[in-house]
């Protein structure tokens, strides 16, 4: 298993990162519920009362360990936590119990086994007791419970799996999607950091489109601490070779590259470079590795590496990463063909007016290559026409579909077969005038047979438009 190894990159910081959850938890620790009143009113059982008060009154870790050991045989600790969390009506007191529970696990990771053992004796999983709490209305309760679930899933030897794991990742993804309204985003990110350090959980996260959710969150407006936490989660994913192999097609490299080109925080730069090193070193297939490297080059990573190389760092890991990436990326651009560059750009989904798009020589020599891998490039261009909302991407994709049809005899048939003609025609009514213009040119190329006449006609139209603008 590809667990996260020792590295100078900081581990999950559960104590020092200031978050709303931690600030509220600190207040709760100073406001113990009146358990005596609950007991006298028969709202909690005597066993629960005895355990919770004994644990609260313990003054040291040693004393708390003694309380837990004395109640281990009958699983009282697990029973009491479950009973108080699910049966106490007052949210304020449930918040307190959850904070106590979280502190209990944070103080000693091995304590999670008490809860797994108790659940096993009842022939159930610990998750079945607590996943339902994630549907509560109180946001603190929900997020503190999420933090506890992550610890139960990571600190011990029992791993979450199946529908329980799917449900939990689905919850975390929804929390990430609500980044503008979620005041506990740092807690969500920390849960992901913990979970994705374990290889058993990575594939399920990727298979459930978790990477797309991460990329969207990274592309949004996030503060520095949250940005670092999310990139940490990506870094954990890249330790898995299968996931690293998919990185070029998942949008990970572009998202990290954009941040790298703008970030001045060494902490962020360090972990992005470490992620890039993982991607290039975990992939064996030459073509995939080269595509990943080209995407990094397109994100101006080489320029960042040059600036970093001029500085002196005390961190040997960072120096090694800079050296490795510089060598790999420099090698990738050596003898780079124009089609390699174009292919990488299309695969990234981030089209722009790079020189190849307007090069007659490029289209004459490479149009037939669009048919490789079952018309992969054609399919990607059509998908961009159907799904992108970026006017620049729509303009370039329309142009390229038209040029493919113009230079490949059977291009019209291929484009129509994959609904490309319909996709282009829908853009004739786009709001952006440039999109409408390039869509119109593409439609004309799809319909006209006399390319020489069309070329002269288009030149004439452009000249007329230019005169009109003047």
UniProtKB/Swiss-Prot annotation:
Question: What's the domain of life for this entry?
Answer: Eukaryota
Q: Which UniProt keywords apply?
A: Hydrogen ion transport, Ion transport, Transport
Q: Name one GO cellular component term.
A: vacuolar proton-transporting V-type ATPase, V1 domain
Show the CDD domains listed in the entry.
VATPase_H
Q: Does the keyword Glycosyltransferase apply?
A: no
Family annotation (Pfam families): V-ATPase_H_C, V-ATPase_H_N
Assembly mode? V-ATPase is a heteromultimeric enzyme made up of two complexes: the ATP-hydrolytic V1 complex and the proton translocation V0 complex. The V1 complex consists of three catalytic AB heterodimers that form a heterohexamer, three peripheral stalks each consisting of EG heterodimers, one central rotor including subunits D and F, and the regulatory subunits C and H. The proton translocation complex V0 consists of the proton transport subunit a, a ring of proteolipid subunits c9c'', rotary subunit d, subunits e and f, and the accessory subunits vah-19/Ac45 and vah-20/PRR.
* Name of the molecule in the record: Probable V-type proton ATPase subunit H 2
Biological source species: Caenorhabditis elegans
Upper classification of the organism: Eukaryota, Metazoa, Ecdysozoa, Nematoda, Chromadorea
